[in-house]
């Protein structure tokens, strides 16, 4: 049997809200096995994302991400979780874990209040609100500020829908079957009541009905709201059934994330010998 160190981290947890943040699995390996093994582990974990990390040099790691259904090109909260694990367990000797990924070099560092992470911004283009998506989101008759198309980063179409207020975002009850049929992942967002902005993220096209706190979504949200509000550093909350809180700073084509990453469990995944 093979034992693989395994951790579950609640990325971007709100310190004031128990059981908040986005759960991510982190599996530390000597080498990547066959992709079917990685996919099987992620499917068995049944978390929105599982991160797999393999050492490649001093404080340097290869990193891959899998949902229960597919491998993805970028996952912010699982990157945040992987960095937290490596820094807290002493696997990283310095203060920063450096990753090589499908989306290029990424990093997670210690900070006074938790951890910071650096990800690339993901661009927006003006889009149009189509009837099928509007109906799937249950937004017929609701005011829309804007709709944007987002670069494909999970192998699926992405859109960001900007709504009027926080209550509208909180009250959305999407028809996930319709969104899955459309083949579209959707971020909904609005100005926040007690923070700069709020959001939710539905990703049935990538095998995740609703992701609790989504780093990659904030790669588009952060520059949009920074430009709209004229702020350099913003506080954000994702307000689905399992909320989370983070701070974001977009600059020079990147987004710096600040947040907490408490460890929920650690142990081992036990695989039978081939």
List where the protein language model places each region.
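Active-site proximal loop and beta-alpha junction motif in alpha/beta enzyme cores
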Residues: 1-74, 80-274
């Amino acid at each position: 049997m093979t034992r693989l160190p395994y951790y579950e981290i609640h990325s971007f947890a709100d310190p004031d809200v128990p059981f908040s943040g986005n759960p991510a699995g982190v599996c530390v390996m000597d080498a990547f096995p066959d992709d079917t093994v990685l996919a099987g582990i992620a499917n068995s974990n049944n978390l929105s994302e599982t991160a797999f990390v393999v050492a490649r040099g001093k404080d340097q790691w290869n990193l891959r991400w899998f949902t229960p259904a597919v491998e993805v090109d970028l996952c912010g909260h699982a990157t945040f979780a992987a960095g937290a694990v490596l820094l807290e367990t002493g696997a990283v000797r310095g203060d920063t874990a450096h990753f090589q990924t499908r989306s290029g070099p990424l990093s997670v560092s210690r900070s006074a209040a938790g951890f910071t992470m650096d990800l690339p911004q993901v661009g927006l283009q003006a889009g149009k609100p189509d009837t099928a998506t509007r109906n799937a989101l249950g937004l017929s008759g609701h005011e829309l500020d804007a709709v944007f198309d987002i670069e494909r980063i999970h192998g699926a179409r992405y859109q960001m829908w900007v709504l009027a207020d926080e209550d509208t975002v909180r009250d959305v009850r999407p028809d996930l079957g319709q969104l899955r049929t459309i083949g579209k992942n959707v971020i909904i967002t609005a100005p926040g009541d007690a923070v700069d902005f709020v959001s939710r993220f539905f990703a049935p096209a990538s095998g995740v009905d609703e992701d609790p706190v989504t780093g990659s979504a904030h790669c588009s949200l952060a520059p949009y709201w920074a430009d709209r509000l004229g702020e350099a550093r913003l506080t954000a909350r994702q307000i689905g059934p399992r909320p989370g809180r983070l701070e974001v700073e977009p600059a020079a084509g990147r987004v710096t994330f600040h947040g907490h990453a408490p460890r929920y469990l650690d142990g081992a995944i036990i695989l039978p010998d081939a």
